[in-house]
Amino acid sequence: MTDKHKDSSKQFLYCSFCSKKQHEVRKLIAGPSVCICDECVNLCNDIIREEIKDVVKNSDIQILPTPHDINNHLNNYVIGQEQAKKVLAVAVYNHYKRLHHDTSHNNVELGKSNILLIGPTGSGKTLLADTLARFLHVPFTMADATTLTEAGYVGEDVENILHQLLQKCDYNVQKAQHGIVYIDEIDKISRKSDNPSITRDVSGEGVQQALLKLIEGTVAAVPPHGGRKHPQQDFLKVDTSKILFICGGAFDGLDKVIERRMDTNNSIGFSAIIKLGSDQLNEDKLLTQVEPEDLVKFGLIPEFIGRLPVVATLNELSEEALIRILREPKNALTKQYQALFNLEGVELEFSEEALIAIAKKAMARKTGARGLRSIVEGILLETMYELPSQLHVEKVIINEAVITSNTKPKIIYREPDNKVS
């Protein structure tokens, strides 16, 4: 009689939390006088994960590296551009300090410190922004301004930038709101003349207008799956006032605009003095004298310039700087390829003359640091193709002739082990 009673009670086991019976769930875990189903376990896990996210989010704001710490980290990955790194370090520190300040009870409202980077191709603009984001452990995304159009026209809406940022943090809105957005080629959306256009300029001034609110700070409605907005779909609300926007561009010809202004103001002043140096030195020095009115003359609208209060200029990299980039940073190009060859059990060596030749080639191409990888990849292509099929290779040596005369790298073989055990 007792055994029969026990058997009947087993048939009526149910979850102590949701009251679902055993046959209604996939798994029911029983404990002393209590049971829990797999659905409730998953729900508890979700609740705990959200709590942990909130704790991590709050602790990240509390622990803020100083401008010195930020600059020192940038030095590990970015060669040269000392003034730009210092400007960025202070601006980034002030931005995240402002976010922390917003949580305190103070009536003083701090403005955003969005950043405009001006410098030639391959000078390190994108690398600076990416390195900052990785150091601060915040989401980072990069957008190309030339692909953006006004809402309603063929192309990408500016809100797609936020969608890309959300993707980087698994659609965690709170985390995305502490992220960094880098908009490249911002100079390419300048209007064609100083006067406002009476026709639609959907990829120039129109994009600047579309970006205004986004950069300044607004609550944007972002489609969860990207693309165009539809009235039927739900939107994610993203507060962009907490997102740091960094815009960058080469601004070819801006030095001439600055020079004309300075010549008009004082023909025997700074502009006349720097003409005594080299052309590149002139351009670098002129860019450091940039004023908002110069950017307006170039084609950016005043309202857009006002949203980018911090301006940092980057110099064109010298041959010496390119050589340092090849070997000094923690993720230097030569170190990356040496690690790649080590996976094959082979040592890769670059002679000093080879590094100089690579730098000279990049200077001739006028591609800056960006062109270094394509040069190194080109000279190592055949070796990397053949190496996995070759036996007993001990070392590969890249000398100057490999770069300048397209000769094959020197390969040193180890003695085969012929000992019979």
UniProtKB/Swiss-Prot annotation:
<dbReference type="GO" id="GO:0005524">
    <property type="term" value="F:ATP binding"/>
</dbReference>
<feature type="binding site">
    <location>
        <position position="37"/>
    </location>
    <ligand>
        <name>Zn(2+)</name>
    </ligand>
</feature>
<keyword id="KW-0547">Nucleotide-binding</keyword>
<feature type="binding site">
    <location>
        <position position="18"/>
    </location>
    <ligand>
        <name>Zn(2+)</name>
    </ligand>
</feature>
<dbReference type="InterPro" id="IPR038366">
    <property type="entry name" value="Znf_CppX_C4_sf"/>
</dbReference>
<dbReference type="GO" id="GO:0008270">
    <property type="term" value="F:zinc ion binding"/>
</dbReference>
<dbReference type="Pfam" id="PF10431">
    <property type="entry name" value="ClpB_D2-small"/>
</dbReference>
<dbReference type="GO" id="GO:0051301">
    <property type="term" value="P:cell division"/>
</dbReference>
<keyword id="KW-0479">Metal-binding</keyword>
<dbReference type="InterPro" id="IPR010603">
    <property type="entry name" value="Znf_CppX_C4"/>
</dbReference>
<dbReference type="GO" id="GO:0016887">
    <property type="term" value="F:ATP hydrolysis activity"/>
</dbReference>
<feature type="binding site">
    <location>
        <begin position="120"/>
        <end position="127"/>
    </location>
    <ligand>
        <name>ATP</name>
    </ligand>
</feature>
<dbReference type="GO" id="GO:0046983">
    <property type="term" value="F:protein dimerization activity"/>
</dbReference>
<protein>
    <recommendedName>
        <fullName>ATP-dependent Clp protease ATP-binding subunit ClpX</fullName>
    </recommendedName>
</protein>
<comment type="similarity">
    <text>Belongs to the ClpX chaperone family.</text>
</comment>
<keyword id="KW-0067">ATP-binding</keyword>
<dbReference type="InterPro" id="IPR027417">
    <property type="entry name" value="P-loop_NTPase"/>
</dbReference>
<comment type="function">
    <text>ATP-dependent specificity component of the Clp protease. It directs the protease to specific substrates. Can perform chaperone functions in the absence of ClpP.</text>
</comment>
<dbReference type="GO" id="GO:0140662">
    <property type="term" value="F:ATP-dependent protein folding chaperone"/>
</dbReference>
<dbReference type="GO" id="GO:0009376">
    <property type="term" value="C:HslUV protease complex"/>
</dbReference>
<dbReference type="Pfam" id="PF07724">
    <property type="entry name" value="AAA_2"/>
</dbReference>
<dbReference type="InterPro" id="IPR046425">
    <property type="entry name" value="ClpX_bact"/>
</dbReference>
<dbReference type="GO" id="GO:0051082">
    <property type="term" value="F:unfolded protein binding"/>
</dbReference>
<dbReference type="InterPro" id="IPR050052">
    <property type="entry name" value="ATP-dep_Clp_protease_ClpX"/>
</dbReference>
<dbReference type="InterPro" id="IPR004487">
    <property type="entry name" value="Clp_protease_ATP-bd_su_ClpX"/>
</dbReference>
<feature type="binding site">
    <location>
        <position position="40"/>
    </location>
    <ligand>
        <name>Zn(2+)</name>
    </ligand>
</feature>
<keyword id="KW-0862">Zinc</keyword>
<dbReference type="Pfam" id="PF06689">
    <property type="entry name" value="zf-C4_ClpX"/>
</dbReference>
<dbReference type="GO" id="GO:0051603">
    <property type="term" value="P:proteolysis involved in protein catabolic process"/>
</dbReference>
<dbReference type="InterPro" id="IPR003593">
    <property type="entry name" value="AAA+_ATPase"/>
</dbReference>
<comment type="subunit">
    <text>Component of the ClpX-ClpP complex. Forms a hexameric ring that, in the presence of ATP, binds to fourteen ClpP subunits assembled into a disk-like structure with a central cavity, resembling the structure of eukaryotic proteasomes.</text>
</comment>
<feature type="binding site">
    <location>
        <position position="15"/>
    </location>
    <ligand>
        <name>Zn(2+)</name>
    </ligand>
</feature>
<dbReference type="InterPro" id="IPR019489">
    <property type="entry name" value="Clp_ATPase_C"/>
</dbReference>
<feature type="domain" description="ClpX-type ZB">
    <location>
        <begin position="2"/>
        <end position="56"/>
    </location>
</feature>
<keyword id="KW-0143">Chaperone</keyword>
<dbReference type="InterPro" id="IPR003959">
    <property type="entry name" value="ATPase_AAA_core"/>
</dbReference>
